Design a protein with these regions (language model features):
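Phosphate/nucleotide-binding beta-alpha loop and adjacent structural elements of enzyme active sites
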Residues: 2, 6-18, 22-23, 28-341
Length: 341
């Protein structure tokens, strides 16, 4: 197994249930420090090649960095490599049984997609999820610039960033769409919310409402596993810390509809809320319908997101076009649905 940490733990849990044992663990050369993981000394890839004549590599972490992805693809050229598709926010695995159970919905979504590129990417993603073969991911990759310039219509006057992290996507949207004059941003992680507001305090000429909230379908207090941004999810059993050090605490949630009064705006909404996309959409219905709305929706946090969220969105916005794009990442993260007029 290549990699350690939370991703490896999740894969090992599935392997244990299947009665499959990991023979050894290895890390990138610069990260081999003589330490152990799950009772085994962590080796380098060179040591693995010296120890085993034939072996299968399971990739247990992800990256969008070009040099790291090049390393993944390089190892895949040397030996058999798979990147298991585990849901980021838990739940069912996207295995053959799950696919067959939901095949009718999967096929309906394919028919709804607006262009052939979207359908090719959709096919590649399903093939990857069922096989773990990362060559499908490389074939599906497109640059985000194409979507932001050529798929979305632009000219937005307002922007809602649900899952605003440290302000990176807010900064990106203002660069692509300088006509934006009103922004609502949700970010529940305290550490990254501080970074977000440090950035928004520097933005001039734009009315920004930053909310230290989880995007949800109602006003509610929930248990939050605070992974400091990207890994912050609703859920947890008790307040404290996880074994990986994430804080588990109470947090306030609210609907986007309760935090803005947008009407008649050319509005872009981004949903990247770590598995709460369905509820966040439910909490946005007034806002969506009161404005000329386009959306960017993440489809990779739960196994069913790839088909359940497009079906929900089509029901809400039947006249909008649905474009699917996957931006460079291994495993199948950064999958976005672009919902356009």
């Amino acid at each position: 197994m290549y990699g350690m940490g939370n991703g490896a733990d999740k894969i090992i849990e599935v392997l244990d249930a299947l009665g499959i044992e990991v023979a050894d663990f290895f890390a990138s050369d610069g990260f081999v420090r003589g330490h152990s993981f799950h009772g085994k000394k962590v080796l380098s890839f060179s040591e693995i090649k010296g120890k085993y004549e034939k072996f299968i590599v399971l990739l247990a972490f992800g990256s969008s960095l070009p040099d790291v992805m090049a390393r993944f693809y390089g190892i895949a050229e040397e030996t058999e490599l798979y990147a298991p598709d585990g849901p980021v926010c838990g739940g069912e695995l996207f295995d053959a049984a799950f696919y067959l159970e939901n095949k009718e919905k999967v096929d309906r979504v394919r028919d709804l997609l607006a262009d052939e590129k979207s359908k090719e990417i959709y096919d590649d993603l399903i093939s990857y999820k069922l096989s773990g073969d990362i060559s499908y991911l490389r074939h599906a990759d497109t640059e985000k610039d194409e979507a932001l310039k050529e798929i979305l219509s632009g000219g937005y006057t307002a922007y809602a960033d649900l899952g605003a992290y440290n302000g990176d996507t807010l900064r990106e949207s203002l660069a692509y769409y300088p006509t934006i004059r009103r922004i609502t941003a949700f970010e529940p992680s305290a550490k990254t919310f501080a970074k977000l507001t440090a950035y928004t305090d520097t933005v001039e000429g734009v009315e920004i409402h930053a909310c230290p909230l989880c995007a949800w379908n109602k006003t509610e207090t929930v248990i939050l596993t605070d992974g400091a941004g990207r890994n912050t999810t609703i859920g947890g059993t008790s307040v404290g810390k996880t074994k990986n050090g994430a804080k588990v605490r109470t947090s306030e949630c609210d609907a986007l509809d309760n935090q803005n009064d947008y009407t008649g705006e050319k509005l872009l909404i981004k949903y990247d809320v770590e598995g709460a996309e369905y509820e966040a959409l439910q909490g946005s219905l007034r806002t969506i319908r009161a404005n000329e709305t386009e959306m960017i929706v993440s489809l990779y946090h739960k196994s069913g997101d790839l088909f359940s969220l497009p079906l929900m969105i089509h029901e809400i916005m039947p006249d909008h076009k649905l474009y699917l794009r996957k931006h460079p990442y291994v495993p199948a993260w950064d999958i976005n649905l672009y919902v356009c007029l």
